[in-house]
């Protein structure tokens, strides 16, 4: 036991509270000093729990200190102890039987002492004889030790070389096994390196939550059959005023409800406009009457008016009112109905425009929400594909590593078998018990012959006797070949580094093309995206052209509805394109009718 451990044990004996937390090796440096070593050894050997004051004694001492009485210390305490009278020790008298027992024990101890002295003398004689023998054997031992040291030096060099290679191999294997340990060992001892070691529960739960939220969002934002309505929203469905025209929509009930709703809206709008006109007219009449009353009051207050002039004014005003009423009745009966008939469709235009605006706003809203959902789905698909690609890459790497490890295991097993065979050959007594070394190699020394064959290679010339000199020559040639191979390896390493630098440059160029100077990976080619943008711009232009064509078609239909001559021209063109014979018959009938009318007019 070390001195520090003894010191800690004595502290435990005397009841030091924190002795269990102390380490004995941390106190070994205390015993290195010459001055403190004797005291510490005395402390470790003599001090025990009896030298420690109890709690009662400490309390009594503290009470004594508080009382103010003098306490003896040092020399005064020594003098007081000298003056104290020692108590007389009364030794009890022993019996005769006890004395006889003690005498017998003394005799037996003396006999044992004599026997041990005789054994000591015999051992001294034996030691002298063995010392003479040891002197004789020292010369032989020195010669054997020299040979042993030489052989041990060779073996130690080989062992150190093999141990270094094995240590390097074990370090590399441990580093490799750190990556392939099971992930249940914990993150403290096994840092997660591969993607397959990470759990996908959190990622999958998040994806499930996002898909659930996306489905709820689509259910809330889109009603059932939205794509059918959007696909069927052509120009004929938006002509809500023309109730007589058949609709393309298959559901006649929805179409009828929509027509009734539009008719109600148009009627409500016309009624509101009618009430607005009446209110404006009444408001203007009230303003004019108030103005006239103010003027009349002003004229009455400014100067007195005669009754005759007032009657004349009233009669003139009544005549003017009669004329205005006649004009109003004429306007109501004659001009107003024609104007109302001509502008009846204009009254319905705000309602139709509002309906169109509402449908366009709904369509824009749904397209925006569809784009959001589409972007989210594209992100999820991209993340899944990226994860799948990374797993496939890692699986390929693991398969390659597994193949390499299998090949390594096979090579190691083969080398292990060869090593066991060589050890069996070395245990052969003809090889191990050879005392006088000779230049020629024994034919039974299979390991040396095999070594010579390995070093020499394929040599057709066979020698009868193999010597150690030949073995050294072959080893020297092998050394030269190894130096040449090392030079070639250095050149190939330089070429490999140049090849790697070139590949790194290619990788950097590829990264530049993929990232385009940014931090995000471009999943598509820049040229393709530009072409897609061009196509989108062309589609937008095409949409504008289609809207212009639809507007032109609407205006032409309005003109056809208002002009009968254009309607007839259109019918002629339709007949001309569909049925030429029918058109000829109609033209001939019209010519005959015109001739008959001309003849009747001449008559």
Curated annotation (Swiss-Prot):
Disulfide bonds: none annotated. It is found in: Cytoplasm, Cytoskeleton, Microtubule organizing center, Centrosome; Cytoplasm, Cytoskeleton, Spindle. The keyword Coiled coil applies. It comes from the Eukaryota. Residues 93-177, 305-336, 389-426, 458-495 form a coiled coil. One of its GO terms (cellular component) is microtubule organizing center. One of its GO terms (biological process) is spindle assembly. Pfam families: HAUS-augmin3. Its main location: cytoplasm. The modification N-acetylserine is found at residue 2. Keywords: Acetylation, Cell cycle, Cell division, Coiled coil, Cytoplasm, Cytoskeleton, Microtubule, Mitosis. Contributes to mitotic spindle assembly, maintenance of centrosome integrity and completion of cytokinesis as part of the HAUS augmin-like complex. Belongs to the HAUS3 family. Component of the HAUS augmin-like complex. The complex interacts with the gamma-tubulin ring complex and this interaction is required for spindle assembly. Interacts with EML3 (phosphorylated at 'Thr-881'). This is HAUS augmin-like complex subunit 3. It comes from Homo sapiens (Human).
